[in-house]
Design a protein with these regions (language model features):
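Mixed-charge, low-complexity interaction segments
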Residues: 50-246
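Long, largely alpha-helical accessory region at the distal end of helicase-like NTP-driven motors
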Residues: 2-88
Length: 246
């Protein structure tokens, strides 16, 4: 006759340990049967649960995401939610009413542009911070505003190390405002105008402007939050990547 295993008395902790290992095994089996898109969604919902049901920002999703899943996202741009976060949220019905209004208009196109703009260096980020302006988003930035935002960005931590040929913070501090502005205009400002899908434009009296059609949407809170989140995430990801590569 078959042996009745239920008659064996295991120590309580043994049963618990066995149960937990079995649950882990089932979880691993589940993961393997899921498509990578489903795994990313599952990870999103896990992070959302950690945040007590709050929709994660890009920064929050990055901070709490499983390292292996994040690395996969970085290597597979097609499935990477950080390259098209509003699209990702739209597909899983997680956009707020205000975000849906942005999503259906020109604001989404602009956010998508700054989310995906090429970044060999970090130089575009202080320019975008100049436009963001602590939440009072500008349609154009003057030379002085560019220099102010640029220096504020590179004064922080070791960000100054992004300047080639500058070997110390003291040496960085010797760079003049005129030199900073020249670098900003010859590199990020030039490239934003060239590859900005017509969003970044010349404006009389300003170092750089964005299209007037954005005048209404830049006042919307949801737009401001998205813009800030994109700039913060892209800055952080740039430095993470640089750290890993070095």
């Amino acid at each position: 006759t078959a042996y009745d295993y239920s008659e064996i008395e295991y120590p309580d902790d043994c049963i618990v340990d066995f149960d937990m290992r079995l649950i882990d095994l089932f979880r691993e089996m589940d993961k393997k049967s899921l498509s990578i898109q489903e795994r990313i969604k599952q990870e999103y919902y896990r992070v959302k649960e950690l945040l007590d049901g709050k929709v994660p920002t890009r920064m929050e999703l990055f901070t709490n995401m499983d390292d292996n899943i994040y690395e996969y996202c970085m290597k597979h741009s097609k499935e990477n939610p950080f390259k098209r976060y509003m699209d990702f949220l739209y597909e899983i019905h997680e956009l707020s009413v205000e975000e849906l209004q942005i999503y259906s208009g020109i604001g989404r196109e602009f956010l998508q542009l700054i989310e995906t703009t090429d970044m060999q260096k970090v130089y575009k980020m202080p320019i975008l911070y100049g436009f963001y302006n602590e939440g009072d988003v500008r349609l154009a930035v003057t030379d002085d505003e560019v220099v102010e935002s640029w220096k504020k960005f590179f004064d922080r931590g070791t960000n100054w190390k992004d300047f080639p040929k500058v070997t110390s913070y003291e040496e960085y501090r010797k760079i003049t405002d005129k030199q900073h502005l020249s670098k900003a205009k010859s590199m990020p400002i030039k490239f934003l105008k060239a590859s900005g899908k017509g969003f970044f434009i010349d404006k009389d009296g300003y170092a750089l402007g964005i299209r007037d059609e954005l005048a209404d949407v830049i006042k919307v809170d949801a737009f401001k939050k998205q813009m800030k989140d994109i700039i913060e995430y892209r800055t952080m990801e740039y430095y993470r990547r640089r750290y890993v590569e070095n």
